[in-house]
Amino acid sequence: MITKQSSNESFDVIVVGGGHAGCEAALTSARLGLNTALFTLNLDRIAWQPCNPAVGGPAKSQLVHEVDALGGIIGKLADLTALQKRVLNASRGPAVRALRAQTDKRSYAHEMLKILQNTPNLKIREAMVTGLEVEHYPNQIDQKTPEIQERIGFIKGIKTYFGSVFHAKAVVLTTGTFLGGRIWIGNQSMSAGRAGEQASEGLTEELKKLGFTTDRLKTGTPARVDRRTIDLDSLDEQLSDASDKFFSFDPLSWKSGEQMSCHITRTTKQTHQLIKNNLHLTPIYGGFIDSKGPRYCPSIEDKIVRFADKDSHQIFLEPEGRDTPEMYVQGFSTGLPENLQLELLRTLPGLQNCVMLRPAYAVEYDYIPATQLEATLETKRISGLYSAGQLNGTTGYEEAAAQGLVAGLNAARLVNNKEGIIFERESSYIGTMIDDLVTKDLKEPYRVLTSRSEYRLILRGDNADRRLTPLGYQLGLIDERRWKIFNAKQQLINQEKERLEKERIKESDKSAKEIYSSTGTPIKGSLTLANFLRRTNIHYKDLITFNLTTQSIPLDVEEGVEIDIKYSGYLERQKAQINQLKQQSKKLLPKNLNYNNIETLSKEAREKLTISQPKSLGHAAQLPGVSKADLTALLVWLKIEKMKKVKRKDSLQITN
């Protein structure tokens, strides 16, 4: 609450938390010229990767590409510190292909700290933020009912554990797992945001006083083992296959160090039996905690209970850095007591003599259900207060980084008296994620997935720059150098597409005979190079093989050209669907409509629509509890009502 204490320092924007969301938020604000401060509990753990030291994966890599296309940092650092890179879903379509990098966690954190320390307009402070300075609007001071969503005041700054006050015009909260954090190993627990680091006190209570609803979520991390005690020669080796691919669109960031291998082992009957015998000792199955954990990153005991018919589960052994023997045991997080964890690890082939350096643990923490936020990530109750990352109920460095960029951008725009930027779900995975967060009543940690987007063929990683870099340039997030690089790339793509649509292969050409000899498919008459590229199992590299190119072009240009041509029909169809949806969202809904009379709506949708009385289908789509099926039902209802009006009008004319 507002205090009479004088401020130690004043800033335009304060970011609370130095994780992946906080770093992106602070950098974005500072690069837009705002006097920005980043407050963190531990300067030595900036942008730490407390769980898997990896960036990317399905849908997550698309997020990283999008953040980079908007001038963010996560993609550049992932490229710089990558130990291994692989393309996932390589044999599938471009909508679901993903780049994943195993990163050097210490190097990643070190490089991020260097960037923060050398960014103009940005200051870093080590302190525990325990309170918020808020000035209430008149007659709003006692309005603390979460159901009432109108603003009750505006942010004035923050207060630290030792009583210092720092004023700001906007505050971004990115507290990760530190609010009320408690780590669990078996039935034993201690207050901590993560292993070896204290939890944050006071801020949850402060948010509750301001009328925010909070809840608890859980996540976990597996044990770390000593690489030198693993029989790696007995295990399947997983090599890098994408050292020439990058998250960033900036060629200055295209650096690849020596690649390191990962290894694969599997659980055994002994593994499963040991877990079954001791399930009652884990925090969840023992009933010590009941917070929901991430569905798509389950503990090993969850896997064995959920998939009881499976005899074995794949486990990956991944390096944590070039200068450490620690190996991350991916897919093997557990809540078992520490004295059983080593026994469990030693049931895995290759790990019979392993040494456990750090035990696995679960962490339980407070979060704010994101339905209390606008799509700009500003809270609905307090003007100028923003929230990003795990505090909003998400899981993952990539999700956090994307939210941090959005929150930092909009906090800066608020200070500059500019309208907030909303990322639409049809324009980006950033928009898809935020739309899901602020409109759906989520009860478990949210992870971005390709299946969450209706427009995933358009929202690919390779075209994130085409979708978002013009916006980034317009907003001041992309500098002139990057803008020139972007335009040069687009020009190359367009020129090559035009060439392929014009130039033809004739049946009598030497290249046509070579194609028939190599593929068994003849060229009949003549064929444009674009139509040749549209053939199944033909790729741009085949144009090079058959001497059908006129110049050497970069790999990212080749990829853009191939996808644009090969999937042109699908892409046009999806663009048409998006345009149709935009038109539909503008359709107005009648005032004081009795939604209870529309039987095709779900019960929850009727309740929410009756209370809210949205002006249009677009507004209805933003309400929590209103599904896509409900929107379709409303659209059908509007069409039927329109037809009824036409019939009534016709009947009146006939009568007259």
From Swiss-Prot:
One example GO MF annotation: flavin adenine dinucleotide binding
SMART domains: GIDA_assoc_3 (SM01228)
Record-linked InterPro entries: FAD/NAD-bd_sf, GIDA_C_N, MnmG, MnmG-rel, MnmG-rel_CS, MnmG_C, MnmG_C_subdom, MnmG_C_subdom_sf
PANTHER family in alphabetical order: GLUCOSE INHIBITED DIVISION PROTEIN A, PROTEIN MTO1 HOMOLOG, MITOCHONDRIAL
Protein's recorded name: tRNA uridine 5-carboxymethylaminomethyl modification enzyme MnmG
Alphabetized UniProt keyword annotations: Cytoplasm, FAD, Flavoprotein, NAD, tRNA processing
Function summary: NAD-binding protein involved in the addition of a carboxymethylaminomethyl (cmnm) group at the wobble position (U34) of certain tRNAs, forming tRNA-cmnm(5)s(2)U34.
Transmembrane domains' residue ranges: none
Localization annotation: Cytoplasm
Pfam families, sorted: GIDA, GIDA_C_1st, SAM_GIDA_C
Main location as per UniProt: cytoplasm
Family that this chain belongs to: Belongs to the MnmG family.
Residues binding NAD(+), per UniProt: 293-307
GO annotations of cellular component type: cytoplasm
GO BP term, pick one: tRNA wobble uridine modification
Cofactor(s) the protein needs: FAD
Positions of FAD binding: G17, G18, G19, H20, A21, G22, V129, S200, Q390
Subunit (UniProt): Homodimer. Heterotetramer of two MnmE and two MnmG subunits.
